[in-house]
């Protein structure tokens, strides 16, 4: 493994916050998820901004806000332009998640982080992929990645990132190996000992119930609530795990023996109808056992949800009679309908709230889960049911605030009207200037009074005006300097409209293409349509004030309220994540070379790390970073990228090893680009001076007889490996030979710091060490025997030894894999040896 692999953790390490990691593979930067939670912290976005121009791709694993909630912010506010890759369901359901989150906040406060238009712009950058589809990263790095099923949410993915060298990097967080009603479980059969495994420890230490017991408990809790004339709220997400529960409850309502058909089942979110519609069109991403056929052999869509009523507002929910069961978003209860309904229903002891997941500890849902667990243990006190909440509402303006709003609105409307009229005036002036040429050509027709008295049939005078086409024609003729041979006669006035053009051609007028149907004036309708007798109310268009309802001015208020939770609180886990014991066994079975544990509380992370350590895993290859840490996952500790200089490329002699692969032996030294530029900038003048000085030194040595003795010659220093040491570069950019430098302040043997822009430059010929020949290839003796036969030699095998020409020469391979050739020193021997050498690439 010679790749540079690093992981920068921005968020989602040793906590339950959103997930965001930056993976570096050589020169490519891949962003793994970009989530956001209800706190909307901007700290990790500020840390990520310097890396955004370097990002080559963004990989999204799941559609919920914890995995992609920050994508619109990165695109709209941080300038992210890299392509985003996600599966088709993650693309569609991810939009539903973000839409619902934005609408939920706009209902109670001003949400300024991004708008719905920003959401649409961000998702336009998403490139949709399918499972097992290989996507090659743009560029020549050879990095490609594949999405595999995660089993947690519809379209959820485990990403496998590969290089051309074959090493795998697996990013798997929030996966489920168990098959559910609407999803298949994940599978790790396609992974063959990855080089790096990036995994999560989310809730790995918490026990899970059996699926059958969990479903029975859910039905029991619902029945106990609705039979007491209470309403039951099931807190669930927007477009992920809600599909599992909606399908389960729809089946229960279809079963008459369950006793639930007399009650109403509601699915409530701002995008409920869109979520169900998308689910109907994505059956190929679901469990194959989900498909059923009725008696007519027609395919039945399992997400028709005949017993589920879709609601998008409180007004629609109020029309559904109680008792009712409501699947309500959002899951953490920090915003959305779940928080609003809880404030309305928590004071009634007949109502019930069922929580299905463990969100972050700062949320309202986490407090209620803790309350439910304490109630089951019998240690919940009355004062524990009192909780303080921040209530946010949007209320209508009244009194002075309403008058002030109307005054400002009138000023804005007046200003907009003035600007609109000004634009219209300027446009009219522009049109008049365009038609000025036509006005000069057309002859004006001047109205005048008739010289005669016109009388009507009843003898009365009529002072009506008349238009004489010949009036003042002679006066309107323009004098011309040149004599005209053809007389021009007056015509009826016609001003040809100037055709307007833009960058795309002639401007199209929609009214020119309007199809006018034949109208029967007696009936007032089309002839092709049948005559229908309508009531008077239907024929006349009566203005309905509800058709143009003016949006009422509102303001956002926020206050603290202490509420008593009198309703029943239950927790039934429907999170869809593998249990801790199964997760540990699955991850250990992958036999990864390195593991980075993220996305989990400190206790869960410590538990998973301890399991790997107890299993005999190398603890030096096991990392559990903090948020903001940089993890180096490269095998070699010191790997640097260098470029080949033009001088070195000119001297390299490649030898083909196999088809498309060539090798070459190089003798070079590592230098900084600035040092080479300085050497080239010196020019030939310094070279001439050096040559002159060298000649003078040689002459002086000859005169002094220094060349005859060897006592003054310094011995050549030999490296530890027996070869002569090459040149290095000191911190100041000067050449250092064998640990010495011209700068007396530099100590012998001190290594310079490695900087960027490193270049391999040819080693001077006097410093090139002698190396033994290297034979590259692994030929087969059977293939060489066929070659000898084609050349006219007699060759045969005897006990694994290739005998040539009756044993005059033999070639065999010993136990260590080394070829041995024996024979008499004849011309044939040297020919055979040369022929055998040709099977290798000799460097």
Curated annotation (Swiss-Prot):
SMART domains per UniProt: Beta-Casp, Lactamase_B
Gene Ontology MF terms in the entry: RNA binding
Superkingdom of the organism of origin: Eukaryota
One matching Pfam family: RMMBL
Keyword terms: mRNA processing, Nucleus, RNA-binding
UniProt xrefs under Gene3D superfamilies: Ribonuclease Z/Hydroxyacylglutathione hydrolase-like
Region annotated Disordered, chain positions: 414-443, 691-753
Compartments in which it is found: Nucleus
InterPro entries: Beta_Casp (IPR022712), CPSF2 (IPR027075), Cpsf2_C (IPR025069), CPSF2_MBL (IPR035639), Metallo-B-lactamas (IPR001279), RibonucZ/Hydroxyglut_hydro (IPR036866), RMMBL (IPR011108)
Ranges of Acidic residues composition bias in the record: 432-441
Biological process (GO), any one: mRNA 3'-end processing by stem-loop binding and cleavage
GO-annotated cellular components: mRNA cleavage and polyadenylation specificity factor complex
Biased composition (Basic and acidic residues): 414-425, 732-746
Subunit structure: CPSF is a heterotetramer composed of four distinct subunits 160, 100, 70 and 30 kDa.
Function: CPSF plays a key role in pre-mRNA 3'-end formation, recognizing the AAUAAA signal sequence and interacting with poly(A)polymerase and other factors to bring about cleavage and poly(A) addition.
Similarity-based family: Belongs to the metallo-beta-lactamase superfamily. RNA-metabolizing metallo-beta-lactamase-like family. CPSF2/YSH1 subfamily.
Name of the protein described by the UniProt record: Probable cleavage and polyadenylation specificity factor subunit 2
């Amino acid at each position: 493994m010679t790749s540079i692999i690093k992981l920068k953790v921005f968020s989602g390490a040793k906590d339950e916050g959103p997930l965001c990691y930056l993976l570096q593979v050589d020169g490519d930067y891949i962003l793994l998820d970009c989530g956001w939670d209800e706190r909307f912290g901007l700290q990790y976005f500020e840390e990520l901004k310097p890396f955004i121009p370097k990002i080559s791709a963004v990989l999204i694993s799941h559609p919920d806000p914890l995995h992609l909630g920050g994508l619109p912010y990165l695109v709209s506010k941080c300038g992210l332009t890299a392509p985003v890759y996600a599966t088709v369901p993650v693309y569609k359901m991810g939009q539903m998640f973000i839409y619902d989150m934005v609408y939920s906040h706009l209902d109670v406060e001003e949400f300024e982080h991004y708008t719905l238009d920003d959401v649409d712009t961000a998702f336009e950058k998403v490139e949709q992929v399918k499972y097992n589809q290989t996507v090659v990263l743009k560029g020549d790095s050879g990095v490609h990645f594949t999405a595999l099923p995660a089993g947690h949410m519809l379209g959820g993915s485990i990403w496998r990132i590969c290089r051309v060298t074959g090493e795998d990097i697996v990013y798997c967080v929030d996966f489920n190996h168990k098959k559910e009603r609407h999803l298949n479980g994940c599978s790790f059969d396609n992974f063959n000992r990855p080089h790096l495994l990036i995994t999560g420890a989310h809730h790995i230490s918490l026990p899970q119930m059996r699926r059958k017991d969990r479903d029975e408990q859910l039905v029991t809790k619902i029945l106990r609530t609705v039979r007491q004339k209470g309403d039951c709220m099931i807190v669930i997400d927007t477009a992920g795990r809600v599909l599992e529960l909606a399908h389960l409850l729809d089946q229960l309502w279809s079963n008459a023996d369950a006793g639930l058909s007399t009650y109403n089942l509601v699915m409530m979110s701002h995008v409920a109808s869109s979520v169900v519609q998308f689910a109907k069109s994505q059956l190929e991403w679901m469990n194959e056992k989900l498909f059923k056929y009725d008696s007519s052999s027609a395919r039945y869509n399992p997400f028709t949800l005949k017993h589920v009523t879709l609601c998008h507002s409180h007004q629609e929910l109020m029309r559904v009679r109680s008792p009712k069961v409501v699947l309500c978003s959002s899951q953490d209860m920090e915003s959305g309908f779940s928080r609003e309904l809880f404030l309305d229903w928590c004071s009634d002891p007949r109502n019930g709230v069922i929580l299905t997941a463990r969100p972050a500890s700062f949320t309202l849902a986490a407090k209620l889960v803790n309350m439910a667990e304490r109630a089951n243990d019998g240690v919940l006190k009355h004062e524990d049911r009192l909780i303080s909440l921040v209530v946010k509402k949007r209320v209508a303006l009244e009194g002075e605030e309403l008058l002030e709003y109307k005054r400002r609105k009138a000023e804005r409307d007046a200003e907009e009207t003035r600007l609109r009229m000004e634009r219209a005036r300027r446009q009219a002036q522009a049109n008049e200037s365009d038609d000025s040429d036509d006005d000069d050509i057309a002859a004006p027709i001047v109205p005048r009074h008739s010289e005669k008295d016109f009388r009507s049939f009843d003898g009365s005078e009529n002072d009506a005006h008349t238009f004489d086409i010949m009036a003042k024609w002679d006066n309107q003729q323009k004098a011309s300097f040149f004599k005209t041979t053809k007389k021009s006669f007056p015509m009826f006035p016609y001003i040809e409209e100037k055709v307007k053009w833009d960058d795309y051609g002639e401007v199209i007028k929609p009214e020119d293409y309007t199809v006018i149907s034949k109208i029967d004036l007696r009936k007032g309708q089309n002839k092709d349509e049948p005559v229908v007798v309508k009531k008077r109310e239907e024929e006349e268009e009566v203005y309905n004030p509800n058709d143009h309802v003016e949006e009422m001015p509102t303001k956002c208020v926020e206050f603290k309220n202490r509420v008593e939770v009198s309703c029943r609180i239950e927790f039934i886990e429907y999170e869809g994540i593998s249990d801790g014991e199964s997760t540990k066994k699955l991850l250990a079975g992958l036999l990864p070379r390195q593991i980075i544990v993220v996305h989990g509380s400190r206790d869960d992370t410590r538990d998973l790390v301890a399991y790997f350590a107890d299993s005999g895993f190398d603890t030096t290859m096991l990392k559990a970073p903090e948020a903001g840490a940089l993890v180096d996952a490269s095998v070699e500790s010191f790997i640097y990228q260098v470029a080949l200089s033009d001088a070195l490329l000119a001297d390299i002699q490649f030898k083909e090893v196999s088809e498309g692969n060539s090798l070459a032996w190089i003798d070079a030294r590592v230098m900084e680009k600035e040092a080479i530029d300085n050497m080239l900038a010196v020019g030939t003048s310094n070279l001439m001076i050096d040559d002159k000085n060298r000649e003078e030194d040689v002459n002086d040595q000859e005169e002094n007889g220094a060349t005859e003795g060897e006592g003054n010659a310094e011995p050549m220093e030999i490296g530890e490996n027996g070869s002569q040491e090459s040149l290095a570069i000191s911190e100041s950019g000067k050449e250092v030979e064998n640990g010495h430098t011209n700068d007396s302040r530099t100590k012998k043997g001190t290594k310079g710091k490695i900087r960027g822009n490193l270049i391999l430059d040819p080693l001077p010929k006097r410093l090139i060490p002698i190396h033994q020949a290297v034979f590259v290839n692994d030929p087969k003796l059977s293939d060489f025997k066929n070659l000898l036969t084609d050349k006219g030699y007699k060759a045969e095998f005897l006990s694994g030894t290739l005998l040539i020409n009756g044993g005059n020469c033999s070639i065999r391979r010993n136990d260590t894999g080394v070829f041995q050739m024996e024979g008499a020193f004849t011309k044939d021997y040297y020919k055979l040896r040369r022929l055998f050498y040709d099977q290798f690439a000799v460097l």
